[in-house]
Swiss-Prot record:
This is UvrABC system protein B. Belongs to the UvrB family. It is found in: Cytoplasm. Gene3D superfamilies: 6.10.140.240, P-loop containing nucleotide triphosphate hydrolases, UVR domain. Pfam families: Helicase_C, ResIII, UVR, UvrB, UvrB_inter. The UvrABC repair system catalyzes the recognition and processing of DNA lesions. A damage recognition complex composed of 2 UvrA and 2 UvrB subunits scans DNA for abnormalities. Upon binding of the UvrA(2)B(2) complex to a putative damaged site, the DNA wraps around one UvrB monomer. DNA wrap is dependent on ATP binding by UvrB and probably causes local melting of the DNA helix, facilitating insertion of UvrB beta-hairpin between the DNA strands. Then UvrB probes one DNA strand for the presence of a lesion. The beta-hairpin motif is involved in DNA binding. Keywords: ATP-binding, Cytoplasm, DNA damage, DNA excision, DNA repair, Excision nuclease, Nucleotide-binding, SOS response. HAMAP family: UvrB. Residues 450-616 form the Helicase C-terminal domain.
Amino acid sequence: MSEHHSDTRDDLDESKFVTFEGSPFQLYQPYPPSGDQPTAIATLVEGVEDGLSFQTLLGVTGSGKTYTMANTIARLGRPAIVFAPNKTLAAQLYAEFREFFPRNAVEYFVSYYDYYQPEAYVPQRDLFIEKDSSINEHIEQMRLSATKSLMERRDVVIVATVSAIYGIGNPSEYHQMILTLRTGDKIGQREVIARLIAMQYTRNEQDFQRGTFRVRGDTIDIFPAEHAEMAVRVELFDDEVDTLHLFDPLTGRVRQKIPRFTVYPSSHYVTPRETVMRAVETIKDELRERLEFFHRDGKLVEAQRLEQRTRFDLEMLQELGFCKGIENYSRHFSGAAPGEPPPTLVDYLPPDALMLLDESHVLIGQLNGMYNGDRARKENLVDYGFRLPSALDNRPLKFPEFERKMRQVVFVSATPADYEQRVSGQTAEQVVRPTGLVDPQIEVRPASTQVDDVLSEITERVKANERVLITVLTKRMAEQLTEFLADHGVKVRYLHSDIDTVERVEIIRDLRLGTFDVLVGINLLREGLDIPEVSLVAILDADKEGFLRAERSLIQTIGRAARNVNGKALLYADRITDSMRRAIDETERRRAKQIAYNEKMGITPRGVVKRIKDIIDGVYNADEARAELKEAQQRAKFEDMSEKQIAKEIKRLEKQMADYAKNLEFEKAAQTRDQLALLRERVFGANVGDHVSGGE
């Protein structure tokens, strides 16, 4: 069990855990399902049990779709994989599922590259670009933890991005390489070391870190690749495993004695020695054929280039069992025929697993597009002798291949696209929100006076301490509008595509805190913009047909005001297009259904009160009060500190902030930054950023 979810938290209310017959999941239910949730859950569970391959959960923003997914998974008791369209959304889902399943294996499988430049060749300029990348250690560990959980247990929920349809090592070979140690096993020190090296662990006596081991006499310490804060000590006596202990690699303190331990390979690309030798032979055969082809065509430069590069890789494979760019030879290792799909994370899933595609209208497009882009780049590398043709088989899955590997699927979206509507056996509607909030009122106004009209609407909203989102069609329009509003005294920011994830999170946070009141953007469909304080969404030039003014985009954008009791959407247009008509009709239909439900149940809509720290919706946190109390105590503590102590505390917070950022916990990082600002203000009388300017 990997330690990032084995911490069964003590502060959870035992009575809130729910279990279902025959299911290994323990669902933490802070509140019972309400609104449309119970029917949606029952429909989906029944559909899966009846053997439906595809179903859709049509859930509006703020209706608690994640909660419905968690309930469905818990009731079915099968391993599940939840796909998200990007890392930010995946991180959000991962955090939510960990809240719902604190005692089960919730895993995270996204691309481990912080930065990635694939190798490529530009023939026009004779320019070869080497592969260059920086791997995020922490995410690599979580990926290894995900495949390990799938092999060991059934109560697994994996949150993944499209990264899951890219090739990784073959599951059966990965399985063959596992080393299980039990007390009393007959195994010598040299054999343990040989097995570890075959699994791509490195021996390192000085720097003991993930994926390394160290030897002291008959004691071997192993730092498993899928763990972040736990290592295992194997003590041998007379070629037999005497004892096994788990210990803290940082302090060396022994945690517990254990009867057995399974060491998993340190990479998904490990292969048994005989497979490597077999691959070396088939690579040589392919190289010979390819060189003959180049010589026949008189392409001598390409032939020489290919031979030099491949021979070097072959030597590395024979000596070490792996080489740089080993994934380009994956077909030779798996023994697959040319053109066959590569093994991916999907192959590690058991046959009865459940697949949930969140924001499926975006995901299906992504899954469709991955293969073509990859293919175009690799064909150049092959044609010009940088790679063997078999490199073309190290690729993401084509969509039809992914379809063949799909298990039972639930598409989740507020606006399902044509594909989902075509293949779904049934659709579960989740239109009613547990909070009683209804979809915003829609008004269409003339586009000719849109800018002045928006300004007067903003003034009203600012008085009521509410926020406004405005979506326009072009960068130029966005810049001009931002400038115009700023000149009229409106606190406004412009959100454009060049802003990175961390800064986006900060801008959204500042909007919620009221640092500014209006956010102008072009594409407001991106994640994280479900902001309860927003009571008005203005769509300028709503009648210009195009991707951002299509029916689905309009419904999604209008939905951005659905978390506020006074939510309203203004569409500025001189004529009503078909897309507008359909979007307005659908929103009105949902609104009518919601109002009818509220009247029947006697519910008064209440706004969502979200702590500013959460981008994560729908999870009520009992530690809210505790956090506020702690903050007040912190402030009091700072008052009593000497300057030296404060300097120390600043150092500590800076490190903490960097750690949070490294672990992709941008929200916490931003919070720590606010604490730092508080402290610096105490010392310097003003928050001077990161440096102190020389005063007198």
